[in-house]
């Protein structure tokens, strides 16, 4: 007779609470992405102050409806300045949105209720108003660099009120 399979504890499933970013497996790392696609928006940096300004213009590879990359595996080949997040740079990049799970975990904070790892539903990031769905006004192919300033918006650097709630609204 074989011993029954050990049932994992609830805590074992919460790998982001027990592992550092460096200790995560590839699939764990990838699952930390909430799918908001805010990092796929074009950004401007003030050369004097270093302040980052988000725009509502996306990378040409972003599928703005799905909030995902059209060619994730080859994104760096197609868009050479696409930043691949890693444990080192998530601690230093000043343009990650306040909702970014990589940033939250690096700071020792927990994920929000709408994160798919918490909710079990990839649509809660949209429900909470965190994703770029319905807010992108074109891609980098549609807007010349010299006109990007006309597309600066505040919302990507902010966390919507309903997203800050402790639990999913009824």
Swiss-Prot record:
Ranges annotated as spanning the membrane: none
Official protein name in the record: UPF0260 protein RPC_1790
Domain of life per record: Bacteria
Family membership: Belongs to the UPF0260 family.
Family annotation (Pfam families): CxxCxxCC
